[in-house]
């Protein structure tokens, strides 16, 4: 009899465990005239009438919408734990999340900062204001998250970066940046204007809660330290995390937990 009760207890515990729902959806970009996939992770709050905050989670160079959910299994757990929707859009192989001045068909700033949030808000029960939206990402996506949040503070209320390429100029021959911006030698002003480190003038002390994380062995470490120091010099509050680690999924699998906790606190405060 005791064994039976034990089995029933275990079964009831398993059944009662909540599980986030992971869907791959097809969104539409009017500016690029094409469908774009996104992974949407919704917490198990089906019967709840409350609207939910949304975290936009961006992938890096050469990645796609499935990177985060396939390589970091805890991402879905975070949606349940913190009762938030997590959206991982396809930012293409090398969009860098801006509207390219070279190829007008690449409008990923417009897509992620405008078209995608509008689509998500129309299909899910969301808090459809900046106080209910945050954005972060890794590498190219870390650049993209800060870049978009700095420029679109009416859309995103908080932002983060993990191993972000926050200054593009030291890397003129890398990651197809010249295809998106033109060569650095010919168009230095484009590289200046699209580097996160040059957009801090858009911030005030109260504009955006920020969390920036980069490993000390990362090739983006020095540009992240420079951004951190610039934010300190201009009295912009932010969390800056640095620990031993490189530009890899081992580092990001750990970093994402700090990011989600940071945004959960932001959502609760608002």
Name each model feature, range by range:
Residues 4-14:
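Sec-dependent N-terminal signal peptides
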Residues 19-270:
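Non-catalytic cap/lid and distal C-terminal segments of serine-dependent acyl enzymes
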